[in-house]
Amino acid sequence: MSGKGTKMKSQLGTKKNLLLSLTFVVVALTTLIIGGTVSWSADYATSSVPPTIIVPVDIKPGYCPNPLEVYGSDDVSVAILGTEELDVSEIARDSVRLQEIAPLRSEQRDVAKPFRLYKWQVSGKKLKADYCTDEGPDGKLDLVLYFSKKEILKAVGSTSDGDVLVLRITARNKSGAPIVGQDVVVIQK
C-alpha cells in the first residue's frame, strides 16, 4: 500500500509542477497582451522562474504588410529575428509554437531586420497592418520556421477579407526561459 501512496504523491507533485508552469505562461502572455512587457521583481538567486524574453518576429519576411492568403496550400515562413541580445541558436526549436502550432521545419539564416516597435501592445488600440518591416538582412542570424497555412487558418478561426490579426509565437530557450513574440498579418480572400 505504501508503494501506491508514494507513486500517487509523485504523480501529484508532477501535476502541481505542470499546473504551476501553465499558470506562469498564462500570466506572462496576459501581461504581454495588456501591458506590452513582462517584468519581474524576483531575485534570481532565490527564484527558479526565469524572466520572459520578448523577441522580434517577422511573418513572411520581406513583406509589409504581411499577407495571409486563404487560398493555396503553401507553408508560411515566420522568423524569430536575432539581435545583439538574442542568439537564435539558443532557442529550443522543439518548443516553438505559433498559435499553438508546431513548425514543419526550421533553418537558421539572416532574413530580416527587426521592426523598431516589436514590443508594441495591442490592448486598447486599433491594429495596424503596417506594424512590420520589409527591410532585408541585417547581418544577424534569424531562426526561420515554416508552418502549415491550413493549420494557421484553422487556429485563427473565421475571418473576413482585410482583417488584421496578431499571431503569437511562444518558445523556450535552452536554459528554460520562456520566449514570446508577435507580428501582424492581413487576411486576403
How does the language model describe each region?
Residues 66, 70-71, 104-105, 111-154, ...:
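Acidic, glycine-anchored loop motifs typical of Ca2+
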Residues 22-34:
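Bacterial N-terminal signal peptides
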Residues 38-76, 189:
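Boundary/junction segments of secreted and surface-exposed precursor proteins
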Residues 1-16:
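N-terminal secretory signal peptides that target proteins for export/translocation
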Residues 82, 96, 169-171:
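Residue-level detector of buried hydrophobic side-chain packing
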Residues 63-66, 80-88:
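Short amphipathic, basic-aromatic surface patches that mediate peripheral association
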Residues 158-188:
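Ser/Thr/Pro-rich, low-complexity mucin-like regions
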Residues 72-78, 92, 162-166:
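Short, solvent-exposed loop/turn segments enriched in Ser/Thr/Gly
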